[in-house]
Design a protein with these regions (language model features):
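Substrate/ligand-engaging "lid" and interaction regions
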Residues: 188
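Glycine-rich phosphate/dinucleotide-binding loop and adjoining beta-alpha-beta core of small-molecule
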Residues: 191-192
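Hydrophobic alpha-helical transmembrane segments
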Residues: 1-183, 195-325
């Protein structure tokens, strides 16, 4: 177990699991830190600045985009690694407190669920209000969406971002500590800002954002499937759920993304509803259109996934500690 022994954060299950639980608790109680102190905002600022330096020709755009991504990812990884090295030399309680303050901004479960609930509240007031609120959450055109489609989009966003904002950062944290979580969050932020095909914000991102999109695909591959499994397990056991398990792979591959379809399909099957993007894909097409109660049920499923993930993380920390000793 020489390799494990070389990873200092696996030596103490208490530090690893304590940091995870405390970060989730602070997220639950307080939500996001102010933007000027938010590391994900800093990442976004760097990516926004870098985007202005990317040339237009495809080959140059790809090379410059890849270089800018690698520089940013390398900087955040090594800064996080050095911070973690210093913090692990402190007493355990100080290490947990400090690591929590650094891990928490990389997790955004409270913000995600609040935004999704806000869409439902706005939709209860009017369709236009629901569309306007949804536009803050998704990048798709919301102008022509029906009430059901607005709700579908909000629930889809909850499922997809449950992976991006909670499961995947924790997955990489459990494997590589703070550097792993920071590295993933940078990659996911880059994909959210650059990972498009065609025009967006006056620029063709087909080549400029290709590296960012593929990197996120690789880093999200395992966590997305873990999210799907946890969503399915979090549903109520029944014969219908058994059939849903059999349909999961088929439904998950209906989306263009190799990863986002998994948590979205799992959410659709667990709720028994239809989710989709008009003209692009439909998940669990035989399901009923979601009503307001389905949004609340989706949030409950998300809560169960977060708690299950924290429990799995604690068990993983104990296993790491035993293997490293």
């Amino acid at each position: 177990m020489v390799v494990l022994s070389a990873l200092p954060w696996v030596a103490s299950a208490g530090v690893l699991s304590g940091t995870l639980w405390l970060a989730l608790a602070i997220d639950h109680w307080f939500g996001e830190p102010p933007p000027r102190w938010h590391p994900v905002v800093w990442m976004g600022n760097y990516l926004d600045w870098s985007a202005r330096c990317i040339p237009t020709p495809p080959l140059q755009a790809f090379a410059t985009g890849a270089l800018a991504w690698c520089v940013g990812a390398g900087v955040v990884f090594f800064v996080a690694m050095e911070l973690q090295r210093l913090l692990l030399e402190l007493p355990a309680w100080a290490t947990i407190a400090s690591m929590t303050l650094l891990l928490k901004p990389l997790l955004a479960w409270r913000m995600l669920r609040c935004e999704v609930v806000a869409v439902e509240v706005a939709l209860g007031a009017s369709l236009d209000a629901g569309r306007a609120r949804l536009a803050r959450l998704v990048s798709r055109d919301v102008a022509a969406l029906t009430e059901s489609e607005v709700r579908e989009s909000a629930i889809e966003s909850l499922a997809e971002n449950l992976n991006d904002s909670v499961v995947a950062p924790i997955f990489w944290f459990m494997l590589f500590g703070l550097p792993g979580a920071v590295f993933y969050r940078f990659a996911n932020t880059a994909d959210a800002m650059w990972g498009y095909r065609g025009m967006r914000g006056g620029r063709d991102w087909t080549w400029a954002g290709k590296w960012a999109a593929r990197a996120d695909d690789v880093l999200s591959w395992v966590p997305a499937r873990i999210t799907a499994v946890l969503l399915m397990v979090s549903g109520r056991p029944s014969l219908a759920m058994l059939r849903a398990w059999c349909a999961l792979r088929r439904e998950a591959t209906r989306t263009p993304s190799p990863n986002s379809g998994w948590p979205m399909a799992a959410m659709a099957l667990s709720l028994g509803v239809r989710l989709g993007k008009p003209g692009v894909y439909a998940l669990n097409a035989a399901g009923r259109p979601p009503v307001a109660a389905e949004t609340a049920r989706a949030v409950v499923l998300g809560h169960r996934v977060v708690l299950a993930l924290a429990a799995i993380g604690t068990a993983t920390a104990l296993s790491w500690s035993r293997l490293a000793s």
